[in-house]
Curated annotation (Swiss-Prot):
E.C. numbers: 4.2.1.11
Predominant localisation class: cytoplasm
Protein name stated in the entry: Enolase
InterPro entries for the chain: Enolase, Enolase-like_C_sf, Enolase-like_N, Enolase_C, Enolase_CS, Enolase_N
Location of the protein in the cell: Cytoplasm; Secreted; Cell surface
Pathway recorded for this protein: Carbohydrate degradation; glycolysis; pyruvate from D-glyceraldehyde 3-phosphate: step 4/5
Gene Ontology CC terms, in alphabetical order: cell surface; extracellular region; phosphopyruvate hydratase complex
Enzyme active site: E200 (proton donor), K333 (proton acceptor)
Keywords: Cytoplasm, Glycolysis, Lyase, Magnesium, Metal-binding, Secreted
Keyword Ribonucleoprotein: no
Source taxon at top rank: Archaea
Gene giving rise to this polypeptide: eno
Co-factor requirement: Mg(2+)
Length: 414
């Protein structure tokens, strides 16, 4: 009876880009949970619908009563059952009635309320008493594409991961050191650079792709040498953003070039080889499993070839990718699929097939820290949540607190 839901409330709040989103409160007899939904700038076509046509305001006026009337009186700990009720209330296969963001906020808030009812942190409630590993933070250093602006690189995110870190504080600090080093190098290259940032806290410079790649690579090498902590580079290409369906080419506007599918595969493979990338996300557009598989065959032994728009945290789509041997890693964003249950099912399938799950933020974030708990609970070895900015640091600082609570903590196995 401790986790019986007594009240559910939804409210409109603002995300890090100044856009409205939804926050859910779930109150039980003996606990309380609060969670907020993020939003993406570059989104996969197969993601669930974020909000109904009337947006957040419709959620507050119409949907709150629909949800509360159905789940008040249920046990918050019965997360699967509550997630199924959310689907039944919605009645569609993509949450177009209540919105995937609404569903995921309620789903996460319910799990947090259940954990609170038993005086447990969320990671222990979901993962049991066994979690001992902390994920490596994959930090955003330079923003381009949909996350930046005019004259920024075409490639959306230039990332780093401190694979040599021995604890989460060292990992976070190392990423921040690289972030600062990159700023200094950008200022050397462009004297007019004033420190502008993109949506995810990475620098938004006036650089070509090649200039950004060189700065990223040399900064990783220098910080690795100076600190003794090995840092490796990564990319989120977000290639669906510049795929031209009519031309059947990848159009790099900043570069003034375009590439066929085969040229794109060769280009990314060459980048992985030249710059020793540890991780490359969405190097191929979201509908091309065949090309994704070809790149994985070429470069997957040396690098994580990660699908975000390709898989959209959807177990059915992931199963298709597994069959095609497309990628060896996937992004996990709960609001892409709408519930914690479906998020967990996708992670479970990924692990069973040796795909590396990367729990991730969105470009439009809040100070909600839930994904830090999910990464630990579900034993994801990597968390992608930026390197700077309050809404990014909220997750990283939560990992510091979680690490303090773990018995014999260690960094994850990569």
């Amino acid at each position: 009876m401790d986790s019986v839901i007594e009240d559910v409330r939804l409210r409109k709040i603002i995300d890090s880009r100044g856009n409205p989103t939804v926050e859910a409160d779930v109150l039980t007899w003996n606990g309380f949970g609060r969670a907020a939904a993020p939003s993406g700038a570059s989104t996969g076509i197969n993601e669930v619908t974020s909000f109904p046509d009337g947006g957040v305001d419709q959620v507050i006026t119409d949907v709150e009563d629909l949800i509360s009337s159905e789940i008040i009186g249920m046990e918050a700990e019965d997360i699967r059952e509550i997630d199924n009720v959310l689907k039944e209330i919605d009645g569609t296969d993509n949450f177009s009635t209540i919105g995937g963001n609404t569903a995921v906020a309620v789903s996460m808030a319910t799990a947090k309320a259940a954990a609170s009812s038993y005086n447990l942190p969320l990671y222990k409630f979901l993962g049991g008493i066994m979690p001992t590993q902390i994920p490596f933070p994959l930090g955003n250093m330079i923003n381009g594409g949909a996350h930046a602006g005019t004259n920024a690189p075409d490639i959306q995110e230039f990332l780093v991961i401190p694979v040599g870190a021995s604890n989460i504080t060292e990992a976070i600090t190392t990423n921040i050191n690289v972030h600062r080093r990159i700023k200094a190098k950008i200022q050397e290259k462009d004297k007019t650079f004033t420190g502008g940032k993109g949506d995810e806290g990475g620098w938004a410079p006036n650089l070509t792709n090649e200039e950004a790649l060189e700065i990223q690579f040399t900064s990783c090498e220098e910080v690795s040498d100076e600190t003794g902590v090995l840092v490796k580079p990564g990319l989120d290409v977000a290639s669906s953003e510049f795929w031209n369906e009519k031309e059947q080419k990848y159009v790099y506007e900043r570069e003034g070039t375009s590439r066929t599918v085969e040229e794109q595969i060769d280009y990314i493979a060459d980048l992985i080889d030249t710059y020793k990338f540890f991780y490359v996300e969405d190097p191929i557009q979201e509908n091309d499993f065949e090309a994704f598989a070809e790149l994985t065959s070429k470069s997957g032994k040396d690098c994580l070839i990660c699908g975000d728009d390709l898989f959209v945290t959807n177990a059915e789509i992931l199963a298709k990718g597994i069959e095609a041997h497309a990628g060896n890693s996937l992004i996990i964003k709960p609001n892409q699929i709408g519930t914690l249950t479906d998020t967990y099912n996708t992670i479970k399938l990924a692990k069973a097939n040796k795909y590396v799950p990367v729990v991730s933020h969105r470009s439009g974030e809040t100070t909600d820290e839930t994904i830090a708990h999910l990464a630990v609970a579900f034993n994801a070895p990597i968390i992608k949540t930026g390197a700077a900015g309050g809404e990014r640091i909220a997750k990283l600082n939560e990992l510091v607190r979680i690490e303090e609570e773990l018995l014999n903590p260690s960094m994850a196995d990569l």
